[in-house]
C-alpha cells in the first residue's frame, strides 16, 4: 500500500522576538509560517491546513483543519507581557491572518483574521516551560479556548464554542 504520487512542498518560516524599549520583560513576537506546494498533487491529509503545524499553533481562532489547500500563508504578531512581578504569570495579546490558495486558480482570494488573548503560568523557569490558556476569535463564526504548553509538554486542544 502506498501512493505513486510525486509532489514537492516547501515550508518557509521566520520568527523574530523584539524586546520593547523601556521594558526588558515585554516582547513583540512575530511569526511567518508559509507552506507551498511546488509541483504534483499532495495527498489530501498532507495538504497545508490551519492548525496542522508541528505544535498546532497556526490558525488560533479556528478549528484545526478548517482551511486546507495546496498553499498557505500565515502571519502572526503576539505581544507578551508580565502579569506578576516574579514572572510566575504572564499574558499575551495576539492577532493573526491566514490565507489559502484556491485549489483551481491558485490565487489567494480570502484572508481569515484571528485575534485573542491568553494567560501563561510558568512551570519551570530553567526550561521556560509554561502552561498556556488562550481564547481566540475568528470569522465565519469561530471562537474558543486553546490550551497548550510551550516546549511541547501538552498537546494543543481547541475547544470550539461557535454559535450561529
Q: Predicted regions span which residues?
A:
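Predominantly the C-terminal beta-signal and adjacent terminal strand-loop region
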Residues: 122-164
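C-terminal outer-membrane beta-barrel translocator/porin domains of Gram-negative envelope proteins
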Residues: 1-89, 94, 101-103, 144, ...
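Short glycine-rich, acidic/polar surface loops and turns
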Residues: 76-80, 114-121
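One face of beta-strands
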Residues: 14, 113-117, 131
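Short small-residue beta-strand/loop micro-motif enriched in glycine and branched aliphatics
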Residues: 100-103, 128-130
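Glycine-rich, small/acidic residue-mixed loop/short-helix segments
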Residues: 110
Amino acid at each position: 500500500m502506498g501512493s505513486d504520487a510525486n509532489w514537492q512542498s516547501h515550508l518557509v518560516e521566520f520568527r523574530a522576538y523584539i524586546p520593547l524599549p523601556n521594558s526588558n520583560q515585554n516582547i513583540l513576537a512575530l511569526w511567518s509560517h508559509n507552506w507551498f506546494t511546488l509541483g504534483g498533487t499532495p495527498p489530501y491529509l498532507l495538504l497545508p491546513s490551519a492548525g496542522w503545524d508541528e505544535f498546532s499553533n497556526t490558525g488560533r481562532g479556528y478549528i484545526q483543519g478548517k482551511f486546507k489547500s495546496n498553499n498557505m500563508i500565515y502571519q502572526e504578531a503576539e505581544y507578551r507581557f508580565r502579569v506578576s512581578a516574579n514572572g510566575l504569570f504572564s499574558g499575551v495579546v495576539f492577532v493573526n491572518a491566514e490565507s489559502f490558495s484556491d485549489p483551481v486558480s491558485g490565487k489567494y482570494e480570502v484572508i481569515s483574521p484571528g485575534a485573542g488573548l491568553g494567560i501563561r503560568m510558568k512551570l519551570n523557569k530553567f526550561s521556560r516551560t509554561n502552561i498556556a490558556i488562550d481564547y481566540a476569535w475568528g470569522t465565519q463564526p469561530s471562537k474558543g479556548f486553546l490550551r497548550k504548553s510551550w516546549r511541547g509538554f501538552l498537546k494543543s486542544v481547541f475547544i470550539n464554542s461557535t454559535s450561529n
